[in-house]
């Protein structure tokens, strides 16, 4: 049986690191307030000349190095992002060009906001299991600093920029064991960016609009449910999970999922304090951090899970 296994990971964070105290000088907030409610202490903000594709390409280079592959061996590129470089072409094709890949491999974007990496990873898994690809580059990359209203203290403290990437390769040994994706558009008003560009004009707000309590309540409920579903459908138990690698949006949401599964926070890769919410980039960023720190080891079982606007959510159970 053919599996899709992670052969390398990489990540990239912009140099500009912004603390809660830095933000407190611009909006009415404090380090204590932000930390108590979210667990966030820092976030990274892209430079004016840094685009989402730049962050993605840097993370991709590091993932390729870790996998021991040349960029020309990649035969599929999927970029999960809600902040593309431009309306079109896809950010994935721009990354393809920046990596010097000229073999004509498919390259496209997936937009499921904070669940985007789950959607992209599941799609790449299907390509590999069907024999349509051997080495897929799956990237989550965001520049959310460009869609945040920096005068809105309820949202500007939450988000950061960054990118994470994995190389997913065909393997005879288990990699991705099971995944599940869900969506419900009935909740779109809880979290969105309503602005549109039409006929050369911007209509609606170009900034993130969020009902914080509504998002929290829905996220806690659905992440617990999908974690249960993926583990049970794979024939596993929560006790067999070595690490949870969650979407890094809010420490309290992460703690809730771990508690529901009966797992301690010692089994959670936690980066929200250093990165903030980087949307589609958060899970691959956390995954790469866990691997490079030595926390995550080969052969261990990982549960990746996340939820984003739409709502869209998903979980992936894999053996690293």
Swiss-Prot record:
One Pfam entry name: ACP_syn_III
Catalysed conversion reaction: malonyl-[ACP] + acetyl-CoA + H(+) = 3-oxobutanoyl-[ACP] + CO2 + CoA
EC identifiers of the protein: 2.3.1.180
GO molecular function, one term: beta-ketoacyl-acyl-carrier-protein synthase III activity
Keywords: Acyltransferase, Cytoplasm, Fatty acid biosynthesis, Fatty acid metabolism, Lipid biosynthesis, Lipid metabolism, Multifunctional enzyme, Transferase
The keyword Oxidoreductase is annotated on this UniProt entry: no
Statement: the UniProt record of this protein carries the keyword Lipid metabolism: yes
Alphabetized InterPro entries for the sequence: ACP_syn_III_C, ACP_syn_III_N, FabH, Thiolase-like
Cellular component per GO, a single term: cytoplasm
SUPFAM superfamilies listed in its UniProt record: Thiolase-like
Enzyme class: transferase
Region called ACP-binding, residue ranges: 248-252
One Gene Ontology biological process: fatty acid biosynthetic process
Subunit structure comment from the entry: Homodimer.
Comment text on domains: The last Arg residue of the ACP-binding site is essential for the weak association between ACP/AcpP and FabH.
Function comment: Catalyzes the condensation reaction of fatty acid synthesis by the addition to an acyl acceptor of two carbons from malonyl-ACP. Catalyzes the first condensation reaction which initiates fatty acid synthesis and may therefore play a role in governing the total rate of fatty acid production. Possesses both acetoacetyl-ACP synthase and acetyl transacylase activities. Its substrate specificity determines the biosynthesis of branched-chain and/or straight-chain of fatty acids.
PANTHER family: 3-OXOACYL-[ACYL-CARRIER-PROTEIN] SYNTHASE, BETA-KETOACYL-[ACYL-CARRIER-PROTEIN] SYNTHASE III, CHLOROPLASTIC
Name listed for the protein in its UniProt record: Beta-ketoacyl-[acyl-carrier-protein] synthase III
Organism of origin: Neisseria meningitidis serogroup B (strain ATCC BAA-335 / MC58)
